[in-house]
């Protein structure tokens, strides 16, 4: 069982961004937390981060994973290309946001990508990733 975790633009700057919104975790801390979860749950996890839409598309198009957790970052609000790629990906998938996008600026409240995911977790900090991973693990176990 392999789960791909995709982090979009500016998520590499965690720990340097507004800590009131994004917390104190660095991207490296987040990757370690996800990898630790994978080891404890006997799930292969790969964390991929890019600030470039095309690189994210290319990674999704490889289709070499059984489940997907994605934080599209700002692409959430306008990337129809990522939305279409997510629609192509026929695996359990969850959109995650560290902050509660529904309590932020108006332009951040709309997600064009969530409607092609199984669900969206927003506002639970980095722990939203763990909840998404748990869901995907359970969903994949049900399918086998």
From Swiss-Prot:
It holds the Pfam family DHquinase_II. InterPro entries: DHquinase_II, DHquinase_II_CS, DHquinase_II_sf. The record marks 17 as: Transition state stabilizer. Keywords: Amino-acid biosynthesis, Aromatic amino acid biosynthesis, Lyase. GO terms for molecular function: 3-dehydroquinate dehydratase activity. Its EC number is 4.2.1.10. Pathway: Metabolic intermediate biosynthesis; chorismate biosynthesis; chorismate from D-erythrose 4-phosphate and phosphoenolpyruvate: step 3/7. PROSITE patterns: DEHYDROQUINASE_II. Substrate binds at residues 71, 77, 84, 98-99, 108. The active site is at 22 (proton acceptor), 97 (proton donor). GO terms for biological process: amino acid biosynthetic process; aromatic amino acid family biosynthetic process; chorismate biosynthetic process; quinate catabolic process. It comes from the Bacteria. Transmembrane segments: none annotated. Coiled coil: none annotated. It catalyses: 3-dehydroquinate = 3-dehydroshikimate + H2O. It is an enzyme of class 4 (lyase). Belongs to the type-II 3-dehydroquinase family. Catalyzes a trans-dehydration via an enolate intermediate. PANTHER family: CATABOLIC 3-DEHYDROQUINASE. Homododecamer. This is 3-dehydroquinate dehydratase. It comes from Thermotoga petrophila (strain ATCC BAA-488 / DSM 13995 / JCM 10881 / RKU-1). The gene is aroQ.
